Amino acid sequence: MLSAALSLMYLAACGHPSSSEGSAQGTVAPQAATFPPAPAPETTGGFDGARAYKHVEQLVAIGPHPAGSEGIRRAQDYIVAQLKSFGCLVEEQDFHAPSTPVGDVAMKNIVAKIPSANPNIILYGSHYDTKRIANFVGADDAGSSTGVLLELARLLCARKNAETIWLAFFDGEEAFNPNWADPDNTYGSRQLAASLALSGDLRRVKAMILVDMVGPTNPVFRRETNSTPWLTDILWSTAARLGYGRIFVNDGAEIEDDHLSFLKRNVPAADIIDLDVPYWHTTQDTLDKVDPRTLAITGHVLIESVPELEKRVK
């Protein structure tokens, strides 16, 4: 993802492309986090930040997993196995991105589908691929949001929801080239949006909520200015009601990310992300950067906002 306001600040921090395996064999051993534990789930709407963190830990242990690599196949296996263990209906959507800077690349979107009597869909999304930088494990950028979405799936797949809910794990969000430029990005989310438009199901998607880089300590989530205002309002007002007003702030920031694939097709969408971190797209994006408390806060806002979203899209 790329922030128009922050891009110049971070371009110097971007790494350079490596082999398709992302030099997984040379990965630096991940460090354990030194943060206090996540709050008890009964204080965060049942969302367990410690469980979400364990998922991040497992994904980091795989090593680099850029699109098309052996590492990403192991990440896919892990995500699918976890979703099935929660009782979710899982759809694996294989596709090819034929025109990347490195040629044709096989990719896979993974979608957990939770049906209801109402056909309207609330779609949550996260990318799980890591940037093609040697030794880059993407603990925050790929890992944190995927961990949050897996824990959200555990809760949502076990209960009856008023609306149909899908949780999409996108491949190929990261650019293959060192810097972000269209069309070299968001391969997975663009593929899912296009396939839903082709099938006619896109009109059923009434809200799309993307999470990305939701692990740093002392996070600041700014209102993403491309996002749909009413959807951002629901998320941010929920955060304020829960006491997170100093984290979900009303300052704006423009971010290019997977949610644009749906916004461009007139689907209301919002992005929760803290890109203002010094380790973005560097090998310092390691496990010790991910705070279980931040995962719990993000998940708490997501799970508590579901009733308001269901009222809106009914």
Language model features with spans:
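Extracytoplasmic/secreted proteins, especially bacterial periplasmic and envelope-associated proteins
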Residues: 51-58, 74-85, 90, 144-151, ...
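Acidic/histidine-rich catalytic neighborhood of metal-dependent amide-processing enzymes
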Residues: 132-238, 242, 251-254
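Bacterial signal peptide processing site
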Residues: 15-17
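Active-site-adjacent substrate-binding region
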Residues: 43, 207, 214-314
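N-terminal capping segment at the start of a domain
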Residues: 28-74, 86, 129-130, 278-286
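C-terminal motif of bacterial Sec signal peptides marking the signal peptidase cleavage site
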Residues: 10-13
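Solvent-exposed, acidic/flexible segments
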Residues: 45-52, 65-76, 105, 121, ...
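A non-catalytic alpha/beta surface segment that caps or lines the substrate-entry region
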Residues: 54-117
